[in-house]
């Protein structure tokens, strides 16, 4: 509020409030009205993360002003197709943890650039920043993606990505690695950081320019894996891809962009929206809601995926 006051903006002058709302649980993508149900759910979700404060703050502003408050493409959005959830390990299913807000915003921008609506086309978006997510957007839904939190997909600046299972089992049981160590490699100290000692792409690019062959090999391997995932997701929509998007901080680098584009440009036009557009996405979502261009949904707390309905399906080991 102090920051608004310093800019001469009164809370009452704002037409709508839009924010990053964590701990809502799996829902479809889109815009949800922030109400008592949302606030009660997120504050009792048992999640210790600053993102849980988004909904209560927005709701307080809305109540104080009588203006609407929205959650736009919230981080737990899960729209995976059933076939994308299956793994070969009984009871272990894939879930969607992805940079949803920036993913969808960039797909919307790509669609507009190509002269179509987001729901009209198929897009593959690779967000490469501190984390790395690749998602297939089929007519407005992210039907397949890697799981950023659970250690799936291409390796990232500080995350391990896909790895062969048996060496990991050996680390845990034969070499005595602790759960903390292994969780760290999966989500904090793996990837470029583990291999090169830094997760700063700018430092790595400088090393490559100075002749560091190992840095070049590792960095290109990350781009290689991104390209492989993008090409694989083209099969999800039977090759009918309208646009491919590269976004996130690493997409500022011409070497990375060139490496990926050379390998996937034959599939569809490659658009580059370097950096992230989460603040823009929040504002754009609120504007779509106010203009009536996108429906505002009511949050129920019911997850978008409750398990497989077919007979014989094994229960999720995580409940």
Which sequence ranges carry the predicted segments?
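Adenine-nucleotide phosphate-binding core of ATP-dependent small-molecule kinases
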Residues: 184-238
